[in-house]
């Protein structure tokens, strides 16, 4: 399947497999050394840093079922998702980081972060809105990717944790930031559900000027659990109820065609 994607412009996947293997080796410590405060073994002091007069920190979410999620307000990055298997043994099902320095200096800068203002690629970093052309920051070959080089994944968000299962992040993106028009106020919530063990992500955004926005999370999952040695994702089963897909060109921009998935590596039905 991976051969169907051009590799030169997949900025967030460049050298990913080498990066993931090295990261998994460090995650053994995180996965198997729980502390009194959290199952992942993460140390709050390792995530406390002053960046441009704003403080980063570690936040632990817990629900009534014992599920636990660790996040930081730098890029709203998810650091671990600890879930029990059928025998009650906990495992982390996302790749993550064990310090704020690792988050900031990661060779995969989008790992588990909130993406904005606009997820995915914008061709040549340009778009026209109501007759006005806007030029965005270029960071992926000829294109703008995931909001630009200093998108939401690099920002320190304001944070409040109103209850153990919920954390709310806020960030105001100034008019013209990375080339996008309008002051954009964003609220992003992580919430653990008690009955379903679901991690719910909610986004809200308001603006004072016509603009575009496309928020998402760039999670890297391995539902077999992250450990050392780690199982691969090859035994994970993926189902996508789609009969068609959109092909991309040599710089990963949609060609405008809509093709059938039948008989292609894109068929996950």
For each feature predicted by the language model, list its residue ranges.
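Charged/polar low-complexity intrinsically disordered segments
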Residues: 13-14
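An exposed, glycine/acidic-rich loop-and-rim segment of catalytic or binding clefts
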Residues: 29-269
């Amino acid at each position: 399947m991976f051969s169907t994607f051009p590799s030169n412009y997949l900025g967030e996947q460049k050298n990913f497999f080498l990066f993931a293997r090295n990261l998994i080796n460090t995650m053994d410590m995180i996965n198997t050394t729980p502390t009194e405060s959290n199952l992942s073994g993460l140390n709050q002091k390792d995530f406390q840093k002053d960046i441009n007069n704003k403080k980063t920190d570690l936040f632990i979410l817990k629900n009534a079922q014992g599920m636990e999620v660790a996040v930081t307000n730098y890029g709203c990055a998810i650091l671990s998702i600890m879930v029990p298997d059928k025998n009650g043994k906990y495992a982390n099902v996302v790749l993550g980081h064990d310090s704020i320095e690792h988050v900031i200096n990661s060779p995969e800068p989008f790992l588990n972060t909130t993406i904005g203002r606009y997820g995915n690629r914008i061709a040549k970093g340009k778009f026209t809105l109501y007759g006005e052309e806007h030029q965005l920051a270029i960071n992926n070959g000829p294109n703008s990717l995931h909001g630009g080089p200093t998108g939401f994944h690099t920002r320190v968000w304001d944070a409040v944790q109103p209850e153990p299962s919920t954390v709310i992040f806020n960030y105001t993106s100034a008019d013209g930031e990375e080339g996008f028009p309008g002051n954009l106020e964003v609220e992003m919530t992580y919430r653990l559900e008690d009955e379903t063990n679901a991690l719910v992500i909610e986004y809200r955004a308001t603006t004072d000027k016509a603009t575009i926005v496309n928020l998402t999370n760039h999670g890297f999952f391995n539902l077999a659990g992250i450990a050392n040695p780690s199982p691969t994702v090859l035994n994970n089963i993926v189902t996508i109820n789609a009969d068609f897909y959109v092909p991309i060109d040599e710089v990963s921009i949609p060609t405008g065609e809509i093709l059938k998935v039948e008989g292609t590596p894109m068929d996950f039905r």
